[in-house]
């Protein structure tokens, strides 16, 4: 991977400057943007296999609803016809996606080399959302090499053990099986206050990063796959780290996080170029972009960014501002506003839709 372009400098691209110029002028119409011939015209937005409609379902099999007026007289009550192919409630459609069987455990990598772009928040809230629906089998791992805060913001502080302690005992834990494996691994995990997901906290000592070599990272991920169905990984900021690169190479789903700021979105775009050049075109094409609103009033730039990232990734989801997240302290999913929960439910469903059976 060292020769695959990881250390390429982030030179501004014409398509990016065109995008920002239009946003600054207030012309936030993605269809009018010049995307540069290198990428062609914007692709159609991703449409999941289970459409998340806002309108209730109407019967589509030719059967009249049970109360509908008959041609010769008033409505007659007959046997209720149940339509089970799609639920009427769009929230229930998304819940069904998250409840589906997952044939093999999936690793979701949350990435953007820029700091302060809500990687940790997105990792935690995705784990919390999926875990609240599935009830078990979801974990958030803070794989940030430089004093990540996921372990502080999520999970109960029932102990101070981190990834460092797990790696010190990794051989012993790997050799466990069945319930013994779950019990043994649990000694190194923290838990959400509502029990919806587990947390593997990162290590605060920066010297420990040297011990997270690619082989060790793969062993940890394989261990977590034995005990969990969904592994959400906060990847940190260092794209040159073998640790970061290994997680991206191993991931099933890339989640690009950003906020509506030029520097944050440009860095995300540069990262996608980097991954393309490193041979991860399929991971990039299947990626989901999360745009988080850090203030109550969305800026015009967010529409332009959404239009741009639709040309680069499978889907774009915008999640709203929520005052419960503003303090930067503990992330408590139950405290979020209903609209915020719905947005994260949709985001999680879009991420998991390709893998649900």
Residue ranges and their predicted role:
Residues 144-147, 204-206, 237, 261-262, ...:
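Conserved nucleotide-binding/hydrolysis micro-motifs of P-loop NTPases
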Residues 292-338, 344:
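Beta-strand-loop-alpha "switch" segments that mediate conformational coupling across diverse proteins
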Residues 181-193, 201-235:
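Cytosolic-facing regulatory segments adjacent to core modules
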Residues 1-107, 175, 279, 287, ...:
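Acidic-aromatic/histidine active-site loop/patch
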Residues 323, 345-357:
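Extended, charge-rich low-complexity interaction segments
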Residues 220, 230, 235-313:
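Conserved catalytic-core segment of NTP-binding enzymes
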Residues 109-179:
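Walker A/P-loop NTP-binding active-site region of P-loop NTPases
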Residues 155-159, 274-275, 306, 334-336:
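Short, hinge-like loop/turn segments at secondary-structure boundaries
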């Amino acid at each position: 991977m060292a020769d695959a372009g990881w250390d390429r400098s982030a030179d501004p691209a014409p398509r990016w400057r065109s995008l920002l110029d239009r946003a600054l002028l207030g012309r936030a119409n993605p269809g009018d943007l010049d995307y540069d011939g290198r990428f062609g015209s914007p692709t159609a937005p991703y449409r999941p296999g289970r459409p998340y409609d806002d309108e209730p379902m109407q019967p589509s099999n030719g059967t009249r609803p049970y109360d509908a007026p008959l041609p010769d007289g008033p409505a007659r009550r007959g046997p209720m016809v149940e339509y089970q192919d799609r639920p009427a409630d769009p929230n229930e459609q998304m819940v069904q996606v998250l409840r589906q069987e997952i044939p093999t455990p999936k690793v979701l990598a949350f990435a953007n080399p820029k700091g302060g772009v809500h990687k940790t928040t997105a990792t935690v809230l995705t784990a919390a959302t999926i875990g609240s629906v599935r009830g078990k089998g979801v974990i958030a791992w803070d794989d940030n090499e430089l004093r990540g805060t996921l372990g502080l913001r999520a999970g109960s502080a029932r102990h101070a053990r981190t990834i460092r302690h797990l790696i010190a005992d990794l051989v012993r834990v790997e050799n466990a099986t069945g319930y013994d494996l779950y019990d043994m691994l649990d000694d190194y995990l923290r838990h959400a206050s509502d029990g919806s997901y587990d947390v593997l906290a990162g290590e605060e000592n920066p010297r420990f990063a040297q011990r997270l070599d690619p082989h060790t990272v793969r062993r940890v991920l394989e261990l977590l796959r034995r005990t969990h169905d969904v592994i959400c990984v906060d990847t940190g900021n260092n794209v040159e780290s073998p640790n970061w690169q290994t997680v991206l190479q191993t991931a099933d789903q890339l989640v690009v996080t950003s906020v509506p700021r030029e520097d944050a979105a440009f860095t995300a775009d540069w990262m996608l170029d980097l991954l393309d050049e490193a041979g991860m075109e399929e991971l990039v094409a299947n990626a989901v972009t999360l745009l988080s609103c850090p203030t109550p009033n969305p800026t015009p730039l967010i529409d332009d960014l959404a239009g741009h990232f639709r040309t680069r990734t499978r889907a774009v989801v915008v999640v709203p501002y929520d005052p419960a997240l503003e303090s930067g302290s503990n992330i408590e999913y139950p405290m979020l506003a209903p609209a915020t929960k719905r947005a994260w439910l949709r985001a999680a469903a879009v991420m998991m839709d390709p893998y649900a059976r």
